[in-house]
Amino acid sequence: MRAKVLAASVLLLAGAAGAGNLARAADAKAGEAVYERCAACHAIGHDRAGPRHCGLIGRRAGSVPGFEYSEAMRSSKIVWSEAALDRFLANPMKAVPGTSMGYAGIPSASERADLIAYLKAAGDPRRCR
């Protein structure tokens, strides 16, 4: 009996450990829909009220030539990686106190992941016009 309980416990723990692997992959198509919120101020290929997102991944924050960033963003020393974008998109004002980006953030981790997948695909400098 004790062996059966032990075996059942091992199987239960193995199943729980594997459940994390079932997390859904980021979806660039869904991210395009999330980006519609950003499009009020941003565009992929050109500056608007906010800077363009073409070539965003790997770019230093506050570095698009000709765009007037806040001092906080220019001096942030952030290089836009997936992790840096995730932190910023969750709460821009917490990530860069003094940023001029007047957006509260995206609380949903899955929406942020989708948006980042879209930005990586659409913002690839080889594809930007």
Task: For every predicted segment, state its role.
Residues 26-68, 74, 78-79, 90-99, ...:
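Periplasmic/extracellular electron-transfer cofactor-ligation site
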Residues 104, 108, 114-123:
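Short, exposed beta-strand-loop hairpins at the edges of beta-sheets
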Residues 28, 82, 108-109:
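Alpha-helix N-capping/helix-start residues
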Residues 23, 77, 104-107:
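Pocket-edge positions in alpha/beta enzyme catalytic cores
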Residues 19, 23-25:
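Boundary at the C-terminal end of the N-terminal hydrophobic targeting segment
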